Design a protein with these regions (language model features):
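A short beta-sheet element
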Residues: 441-444, 448-498
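DNA target-recognition patches
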Residues: 214-224, 403-438
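A short glycine-rich beta-alpha junction/loop motif
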Residues: 306, 370, 471-479, 511-539, ...
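Long recognition/docking surfaces used for binding and targeting
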Residues: 32-111
């Protein structure tokens, strides 16, 4: 297959034929029919066309592949599937149809968990990476080879390589590369635990699995020299998602460029804060490109494309979340869409901008575009927060000198709340004690269920809870809000104000050049979505369940830390 033929094969209609082939084998074999079996059977039928016996087919397959996994798997299919079915498929379908099934079937909604990188995404990645014919391109987590084949065909890159841990996917990639007759180097391996700098890749791409739970992630990555030389894994709490991302960048040749597709949670998840700060402070992150939802057939969630290179003084941010073309039930990126995104990447416009370390620091290194482009709410579907509250007040203005006279180490049942005491979106349980509080400050005591929000950016928000036996005095750098519970669930408002949309509204209504603050007047104009009480309560119930789980984990951590300390003491 040359490049021209490869492009022509993309236009071959094969969905009906693929369905017919799968129907032929249903009931004839015990295992579940799948795209994995479909591609193998189509390859065997294609290979059998000039042959006349099973023995000749086995010999032909053996001459095509030198890796034991692919060879043994194809021999297994020849043994498992009634040979007359292979003969029938070979006789009934022409070469181009069989080749199209082998090369492109995942792009045409044949239901399977083996899916590849969509064509439009591949083209966008290669435009942004600026892949040239003399590049060595490495795909870490290469799956079924979609990105590799398209990249070889579209760019003519000198060397195209892939690493994949899943044997089935690697076999599909191997078969596809053979049918396309593209010289692609494929390797079975683990991109988290192994060093692949030997490929000397000038361009690296990765579309890794998302949301992977890897309990022993530190043990998995400790022998990956590429990663451990890039970052101190003992200093940073690296999640599996960021291990995939950083492993990709770590395998890039100096002077090269890396692109990683990842779901949006990595942009704001609290546990990844330090890693996000690190990649920006070190100048590793070149660009953040928010992509539209429904680009992948297997999920509707939106993804973000992270571009890495060296010595970046600013980060390019592109909000391309609305740039796509509808194609039946999914979205695709057409050539026009791609050029629009690339143009925004190269030059600032209404959907792109260059951001500094200080810009990200103000947002606590949350990287979602809505934080930086603002959010214009639809007022027709929202209600001003002032209409949902009984009061919005500022905390007590107490001088440092006066506060020193009021502070005590004794437990008095009266506490003092400062901005610093709001951690991880909740109020610190060990607040400082106060004594002899003047009656003029009694109006500033917080009540159970009040929302507390910092007066200045970055905006911290917390809910007052479990305070019935304690009085808490709010500082003047905080606002406290009494919600009208007859109109809205207070925790729903808390959730919304903590969201990207809520934070974007707060930022948009802030004033000040050095320190951004929001006035009570502007705070009252914040718009809250008009959800039914039932919808609010459902969301709040789930939210509070997650909070309980986090509290439990914190308590378990404290217990384990104490037991470890006691064990250490036994050594002495």
């Amino acid at each position: 297959v040359n490049c021209t033929t490869y492009k022509e094969l993309k236009n071959v209609s094969y969905e009906k034929e693929a369905f017919d082939i799968l129907n032929r084998i249903r009931g004839n074999i015990q295992e579940e029919t799948s795209i994995f079996l479909l591609i193998q059977l189509s390859y065997l039928a294609l290979n059998y066309k000039p042959l006349s016996s099973k023995e000749e087919l086995i010999e032909s397959v053996a001459s095509d592949f030198n890796d034991e996994y692919t060879l043994n798997q194809l021999k297994r299919v020849i043994k498992k599937v009634p040979f007359e079915i292979i003969e029938q498929v070979s006789d009934n379908y022409d070469e181009n149809t069989l080749k199209a099934i082998i090369l492109f079937s995942e792009d045409n909604d044949i239901r399977s968990n083996l899916s590849g990188t969509p064509l439009g995404v591949t083209k966008l990645v290669n435009e942004l990476l600026e892949v040239q014919s003399d590049d060595t391109v490495l795909d870490l987590g290469s799956g079924i080879g979609s990105y590799l084949l398209e990249t070889k065909m579209e760019t003519g890159a000198e060397k195209v390589c892939g690493v994949e841990i899943n044997i089935q996917m690697n076999i599909i990639s191997t078969i596809r590369a053979k049918v396309a007759q593209f010289p692609i180097q494929l390797k079975l391996g683990n991109i988290l635990s192994q060093d692949y700098r030997s490929f000397k890749a000038t361009k690296v791409f990765s579309n890794p699995p998302v949301g992977v739970r890897e309990p022993g992630i530190d043990d998995t990555i400790k022998d990956n020299n590429a990663l451990t030389e890039l970052i101190d894994i003992e200093e940073y709490n690296i999640s599996a998602d960021w291990a995939f991302i950083l492993s990709s960048y770590a395998n890039q040749k100096p002077g090269g460029k890396t692109a990683v597709l990842m779901y949006n949670q990595v942009l704001f998840r609290e546990q990844d804060h330090d890693i996000r700060e690190k990649i920006i402070s070190e100048g590793w992150l070149e660009a953040i490109i928010a992509l539209p939802e429904k680009l992948f057939p297997s999920t509707a969630i939106p993804f973000t494309l992270l571009i890495f290179s060296e010595n970046n003084e600013t980060v390019r941010m592109v909000d391309a979340s609305e740039i796509s073309t509808r194609d039946q039930k999914k979205n695709i990126l057409t050539n026009k869409n791609i050029q629009e995104i690339v143009a925004a990447y190269k030059q600032e416009n209404e959907i792109s901008k260059h951001l500094t370390y200080e810009d990200f620091e103000k947002q606590e290194f949350i990287l979602t575009p809505i934080r930086y482009f603002g959010f214009i709410p639809d007022a027709s579907k929202m209600t001003p927060i002032d209409d949902l509250t009984r009061s919005i007040n500022r905390g007590a203005m107490i001088s440092r000198k006066e506060l020193d006279t009021m502070t005590t180490t004794k437990e008095t049942g009266i506490k003092y709340l400062k901005i610093q005491d709001i951690e991880n979106a909740s109020i610190n349980k060990n607040l400082p004690n106060l004594k002899n509080v003047d009656e003029k400050y009694h109006n500033y005591f917080l009540e159970e269920g009040n929302l507390v929000i910092s007066k200045s950016s970055p905006y911290k928000i917390a809910r007052v809870e479990n305070s019935k036996n304690t009085k808490i005095l709010a500082t003047g750098n905080l606002y406290y809000i009494e919600i009208d519970e007859d109109k809205v669930n207070p925790t729903f408002i808390e959730m919304y104000l903590k969201s990207d949309e809520g934070q974007a509204q707060l930022e948009r209504l802030s004033t000040g050049s050095v320190i951004e603050t929001i006035s009570i007047k502007n705070l009252k104009t914040i718009l809250i979505p008009n959800l039914s009480r039932e919808e609010q309560d459902t969301l709040v119930k789930e939210y509070l369940e997650y909070e309980e789980q986090l509290d439990l984990l914190d308590r378990q951590k404290e217990i384990i830390s104490q037991r470890r300390k006691e064990l250490i003491e036994k050594v002495l």
